[in-house]
UniProtKB/Swiss-Prot annotation:
Binding site for Mg(2+): D86
Name listed for the protein in its UniProt record: Ribonuclease VapC6
Domain called PINc: residue spans: 26-120
Gene for this chain: vapC6
Domain of life: Bacteria
Entry function: Toxic component of a type II toxin-antitoxin (TA) system. An RNase. The cognate antitoxin is VapB6.
Keyword annotations from UniProtKB, A to Z: Hydrolase, Magnesium, Metal-binding, Nuclease, Toxin-antitoxin system
Annotated InterPro entries: Type_II_TA_system_RNase, VapC_family
Amino acid sequence: MAAATTTGTHRGLELRAAQRAVGSCEPQRAEFCRSARNADEFDQMSRMFGDVYPDVPVPKSVWRWIDSAQHRLARAGAVGALSVVDLLICDTAAARGLVVLHDDADYELAERHLPDIRVRRVVSADD
């Protein structure tokens, strides 16, 4: 559900997106677009998501899931490790049986501590 930054990986995601195998949810798009340096770049990013990645709706029960997830993370000593956006993305993926594509170690922590979270790093941790 996250976009990649390296050319080879980005091309692979474009091919999978063309097959409708990669989607994007509103929280992920909002987080990605906040890296825009100006209005034109913001518009380009927004168009890219609309053109390439199908929408994956956030579940209506997301806040109950987040409350439960934060409780599990607190028991593991990691309550502050995931942002609200990270948790929204995790629930959206978990509710639909999807894998979170990421470039962020926080999602690996989520996979260790939260049920139904599956993740895949899209770039090497060494890059």
